[in-house]
Amino acid sequence: MYFPVFTQIEGKRFLIMGGGKVAARKVHTLLQYGADIVVIAKKVCDEIKEVLPEKSIFEDFIKNAESDFLEKEIQKAVLVVAATSSREENHRVAELCHAYHILVNVADSEAESSFIFPSVVRKGNISIGINSGTGSPAVSKQIRCQIEKAVPDYYADIAIFMGELRQYVKANFEEEAMRRYILKTAAAKAFSKERVLTENEIKEIIRQGQND
């Protein structure tokens, strides 16, 4: 069973083993969150070459695999994805990662994976990760579609607004109870109105909190 964790990956080094369609999907996903990606593969597809700089791509997999190059690259990485077309190579990468306590996702073996890519719903800064727990991407996809319908776009605007309001409240109100009142009341009103609150509406919430 996997525990859902959101981690900061911006600027962190990811090693992708493989250069095909599966690897390209992983690269696309990770780039959205600012990861520093290196790809090692026998052949790298155009989708990857179009989005990564040449220095981040090593396209002579056979030569690299026969040297200690791969092992050194794994040790540099925070997370590794094994997405080659070879079961043997994916298994080898997984074993090296486990030996060095590096988290690895193995595209063709969830049993060898120490982390997985969830199905993700993203609305602005809001990210919702989904794992069905069944090993079935089709189930996760259906759940994702239902959540996408249930989460309107204005949620993203409210999330940004509440983040900014939280910083303002922390800087201007010392009493914890008052902070909680303002933020809880503002969030409830914003979602009920389905929009960001106006400055006057915030002032009214603060006034009510001070009078209670």
Task: Give residue ranges: language-model regions.
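Glycine-rich, highly charged phosphate/nucleotide-binding loops
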Residues: F58-Q75
